Amino acid sequence: MSGKVLALVLLFRTFDQLLSHNRTRPNILMVMTDAFDGRLTFDPGSSVVKLPFITYLQELGVTFLNAYTNSPICCPSRAAMWSGQFVHLTQSWNNYKCLDANVTTWMDLLESNGYRTKRIGKLDYTSGSHSVSVCSNRVEAWTREVQFLLRQEGRPVAQLVGNMSTVRVMRKDWENTDEATRWLRQRAESPQQPFALYLGLNLPHPYKTESLGPTAGGSTFRTSPYWLEKVSSEHVSVPKWLPVAAMHPVDFYSTFTKNCSGSFTQEEITNVRAFYYAMCAEADAMLGQLISALRETRLLGNTVVVFTADHGELAMEHRQFYKMSMFEGSSHVPLLFTGPGLMSGVQVNQLVSLVDIYPTILDIADVSPVGPLSGYSLLSLLANYTSFSGRPHPDWVLSEYHGCNANSSTYMLRSGRWKYLAYADGLSVPPQLFADLSLDKEELHNVVFKFTDVYAHLDKLLRSIVDYPAVSAAVHLYNKKAFVAWSQTLGRNYSQVISNLRWHIDWQKDPSANERAIEKWL
């Protein structure tokens, strides 16, 4: 056999092997929502709002009951999911400072290993991609480290729009869902090559409050009567609040900067919560449109569907809305898988987090990871393998937060029945410890001084995972450098710009004192 003929034979054999391999690998669809409380995906939380397509995933797949974000804010959490690494390793400190644009994600690896890939909608994992708003992201540091308080967010409000026929409230998300649906139908025409599709939704993140100007954050919970009807009003609870004097100092700071330190009527609180649940129902319908497209194109049987979120939403729990907190409403995320070869109707108690998605998807696609990962593959929990060569998942998860609306870097270690919160250098801010979340589900009882042996054990474990005093110091240094770099770009306009940053009501009372506080910090 001539060399040319042999080369052709080997080429066609390799191509045939590739085609055969592709036919055995499943398609992958991930839907990642923004600010979806994971407790709504299982009882008793699931009773408050009808989520038929999440229920469908529950019945046909695997639901993780204890899934957590690795950082309760948009960009850092997504950086963890896309990179498979903890945010302190990638220095993804806030919504401005995240991953480099050329970082290798799990989807990049799928593409280089034969998958047809597509990303649609909200991505938010690279530096500068979320926002360049000077007060909310890039130089948010000064709002948390100088010794005066600022109001950064608008007061949370509920807004009803449209009527019973108004289905598409969040139009941009629906447009992205329509694009993803069209892309799926196109893939059905060439099923030989496996695909991986990612759809990022903005729902159920609250909308911008337009009256606060173009740089406003999201404090409006908007929905229509159509979606509000999906909410069981009798199950919408009014959360208990600690007295202000009993609040942890970091929690009080968050309450103040989120504009929640004033009084709220019971109606205001229940409206915010009910409208938020209705927004979750709208997001569920977008998931449903993609599931329906998979079913209609006969792709569903060979597609792994993943549903998750970057973080949760407090929805007035702990006298707060938004995220940026380690309380369950903010840190607990949904994580559901369904697809060929995976178990059906199973609930898993194992503690997991967003960094675990990276190695899990690569395992499902039979692709090897590149470089060290913080996450662990969950495939053995999804497919009930009797033999599994991967690393066993530890009995802990780590989450950390370094952004705005909190005046200290915060570290959460969930381990067994405990949730341990450490702050800053571990000395200057008192820790918190919550026991048995099934009994203290509202997380109102800090028992750190009651269980000192547990506190000592968990702090030692946390320090073995991350040198959190050193990380806090690195964030502190970054904050100063970021602020100086920003202020230098303003030149003579610095004083005017800084005095007019969004929602600031305190600056004009004593601008000189405020500027001296910043100079002292620097």
Q: Where are the regions a protein language model picked out?
A:
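Short, solvent-exposed loop/turn segments at secondary-structure junctions
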Residues: 35-38, 72-73, 86-88, 123-126, ...
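Short, structured active-site-proximal loop/turn typified by the sulfatase FGly-forming signature C/S-X-P-X-R
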Residues: 41-77, 84-85, 111-118, 238-239
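Cleavable N-terminal signal peptides of Sec/SRP-targeted secreted and luminal proteins
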Residues: 2-17
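C-terminal cap/loop subdomain of S1 sulfatases and analogous C-terminal strand-loop tails that border
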Residues: 311-317, 355-358, 363-437, 465, ...
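Active-site-proximal cap/lid insertion segments
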Residues: 23-26, 35-48, 148-170, 185-193, ...
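Catalytic-site neighborhoods of secreted/periplasmic enzymes
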Residues: 80-179, 183-189, 210, 216-225
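Long, internal low-complexity/basic segments
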Residues: 22-26, 33, 37-38, 63, ...
